[in-house]
């Protein structure tokens, strides 16, 4: 049964025992709310133990027509996105970054954001590095989970 992060958190907070999988920052919020909950494993660390590429946990999606008609806008967006990742990842910016995360509703408050940011593994991979990383991830998934086959190279933005 699929549940939202909020539903999983509510279930864990109301149960005496249980196991769940939550993304950061939802996991961070749960750990802060209930001292009886513990992190049993770190998926990124587990992945790193068996793979030469990082674990991809998110992506940027755009319509092909937009990318083809506005490549300069896509490149500018990726540059700004990279700047944002650098800002968020700089320990000296942690408090300000946490305030922004809370302000824009990504977390319930800045305290959760400040604790979660170091665990987020924020990165931006582009070009062939991104393609190699995602391809390695697809190789370990059940084919049915990704539509029966690994996507074509045309799926990737390779400027």
Question: Which residues does each PLM region occupy?
Answer:
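Short secondary-structure capping/turn micro-motifs that flank functional sites
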Residues: 28-29, 117, 157-158
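Secondary-structure end/capping motifs
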Residues: 67-143
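Generic secondary-structure boundary/loop-capping signal
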Residues: 52, 57, 64, 114, ...
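Short, solvent-exposed coil/turn linker segments
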Residues: 39-42, 126, 151
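Pocket-lining segment of extracytoplasmic ligand-binding domains
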Residues: 7-100
